[in-house]
């Protein structure tokens, strides 16, 4: 969404963990992500242009130090290109209060090598690393990450899974209080408040601290009511929706698979987070203590377009009390002094969950039509299997 890379139409692209390459019979251009928010670029026989996709008030200017700087106003970002060989040209057509067709082009009769720094305010100092050094650093970093990735499955699948977790990790910045694993760096540039739990499970063996950070990146923005935001990114915390409370289940899995992960400091931090989250669902998402909590919108369930929301909401579903029961089980482990309290709370929810049992399967109810127990072919009816022995025979 920031730049369009302009190269000849016959360019063939190839990708490794450390380098993206575009090649034609006439030459090639290589791209490497360096330290911080820096892109290294090197080319031979070709010109590469980074053309801003365009937003109101984009423009380019020359800094007091004589450097050419591009402002992507819609992204609230500045870009400063530099070269150590070849040349870089910044262009734009001034239109009273902005520039159209803003672009940066790298070229050179003998090839070129340079960088683009992305920054919000003050440009960083020029790097002393060459392209080859930056590439070697990226390769070493990924090799170290891959070496800590558990064995299993097909070799290529393991490598790709490790790469996605490594490449989608962004540093703490702006609204992000911790290093966070985005779901994608293309369109889904957020950390959603249930995806974070699965990311934590995925990286716990490689980096226990990063696994904890995935919980903290969301819980650091927990509303005083206990509500978690739908997602967070470096700019905002979004509360129009939330996501299902899978975190107790995920933490139980982490403790089972990696017992050393649960330090006393983490235990002391997790308990109030989970307690407030449970309180939100039991206080604000249901009518009274004799009722099940409900999802108001499909987006909150994680089953965004599921059939059980075809008639609207709020909807009583079997997965939500299941996750809350597992939250109680998790709190009983983390907060052993009050284990009886949490187990009793879980038992009360289990009794209420039975009201969604048809005799053959779990169904759903609309809060506006609570006497009608609906059943369809959604997999949501199988989520209570996570409760194991808590289910009545």
Language-model segment annotations:
Residues 362-393:
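Carbohydrate-active enzyme catalytic cores, enriched for enzymes
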Residues 100-102, 197-198, 369:
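Short alpha-helical segments and helix-capping/turn motifs at coil-helix boundaries
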Residues 35-38, 42-189, 259-260, 268-280, ...:
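Acidic/polar, glycine-enriched structural segments that form the non-catalytic walls/loops
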Residues 108-111, 115, 124, 225, ...:
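The feature captures the catalytic groove of carbohydrate-active enzymes
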Residues 147-252, 375-387:
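Substrate-binding groove/exosite segments of carbohydrate-active enzymes
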Residues 151-154, 203-215, 254-275, 289, ...:
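Structural helix-adjacent loops and short alpha-helical linkers that scaffold large soluble proteins
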Residues 164-173, 207-227, 270-290, 344-361, ...:
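Long, well-ordered core segments of solenoidal/helical folds
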């Amino acid at each position: 969404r920031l730049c369009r890379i302009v190269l000849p139409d016959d360019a063939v692209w190839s990708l490794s963990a450390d380098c993206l390459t575009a090649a034609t019979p006439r030459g090639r251009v290589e791209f490497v992500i360096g330290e911080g928010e820096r892109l290294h670029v090197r080319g031979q026989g070709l010109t590469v242009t980074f053309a801003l996709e365009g937003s109101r008030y984009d423009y380019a200017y020359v800094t007091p130090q004589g450097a050419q700087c591009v402002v992507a106003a819609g992204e609230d970002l500045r870009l400063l290109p530099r070269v150590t060989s070849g040349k870089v040209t910044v262009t734009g057509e001034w239109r009273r209060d902005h520039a159209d067709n803003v672009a940066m082009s790298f070229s050179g009769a003998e090839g070129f090598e340079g960088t683009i720094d992305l920054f919000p305010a003050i440009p960083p100092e020029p790097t002393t690393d060459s392209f080859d050094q930056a590439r070697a650093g990226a390769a070493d970093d990924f090799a170290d990450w891959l070496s800590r990735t558990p064995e299993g499955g097909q070799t290529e699948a393991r490598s790709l899974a490790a790469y996605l977790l490594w490449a989608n990790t962004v540093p703490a910045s702006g609204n992000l209080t911790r290093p966070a694993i985005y779901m994608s760096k293309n369109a889904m540039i957020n950390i959603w408040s249930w995806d974070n739990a699965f990311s934590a499970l995925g990286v716990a063996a490689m980096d226990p601290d990063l696994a904890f950070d995935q919980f903290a990146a969301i819980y650091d923005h927990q509303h005083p009511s206990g509500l978690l935001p739908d997602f967070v990114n470096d700019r905002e915390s979004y509360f129009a929706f939330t996501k299902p409370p899978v975190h107790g289940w995920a933490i139980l899995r982490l403790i089972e698979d990696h017992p050393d992960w649960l330090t006393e400091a983490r235990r002391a931090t997790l308990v109030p987070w989970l307690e407030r989250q449970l309180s939100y669902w039991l206080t604000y998402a249901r009518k009274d203590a004799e009722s099940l909590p409900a999802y108001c919108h499909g987006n909150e369930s994680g089953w965004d377009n599921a059939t059980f929301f075809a008639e609207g909401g709020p909807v009583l579903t079997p997965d939500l009390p299941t996750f809350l029961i597992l939250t109680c089980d998790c709190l009983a482990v983390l907060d052993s002094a009050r284990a009886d309290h949490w187990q009793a709370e879980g038992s009360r929810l289990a009794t209420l969950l039975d009201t969604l049992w048809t005799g053959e399967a779990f169904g759903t109810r609309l809060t506006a039509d609570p006497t009608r127990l609906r059943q369809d072919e959604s997999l949501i009816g199988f989520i209570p299997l996570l409760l194991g022995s808590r289910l009545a025979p």
